[in-house]
Amino acid sequence: IEKGETKILPLVLDLTNPSSSLGWASQERLSLLERGPADTILALALIHHLAIANNVPLDRIAHFLKSLCHSLIIEFVPKSDSQVQRLLSTRTDVFPDYTRETFETEFQKHFFIERVIKIRSTERYLYLMRGQKT
């Protein structure tokens, strides 16, 4: 790595509607899927937005994230969390499968869970996962 250079690429995008390839012959700016897979993705405060706010099932989230990276650091935010309660305050809770147990079951189809840390003073958990060979 050149001095002062990092290999960190922060991306801000709507994962439920990612941009396609752009530019001449669709080759100047590659789509998110074409850029990867990344070594590691850091996904904090994300899962509840995809699952609760955007109705994306946990199995689809796990499959998609596996297509983007080799390893994953992801935070699970339970329904009891104030931010999830805020998302649910304007709608009926139709998410019986949004549980930590289901999260682990679905993600273990694509990743090995290497470490789980409970975040102090919260009900949130941080997971380190490594992708399974497919």
Task: Locate each region found by the language model.
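A short, conserved alpha-helix within the catalytic core of class I
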Residues: S20-S26, H49-L65
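S-adenosyl-L-methionine
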Residues: I1-G36
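Conserved beta-strand signature within the Rossmann-like core of class I S-adenosyl-L-methionine
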Residues: I61-Q83
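Short alpha-helix
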Residues: D93-F111
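Structural signature of nuclease core domains in nucleic-acid processing machines
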Residues: V12, N17, I61-F64, H110-I113
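Core SAM-dependent methyltransferase catalytic element
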Residues: E28-L30, R115-T134
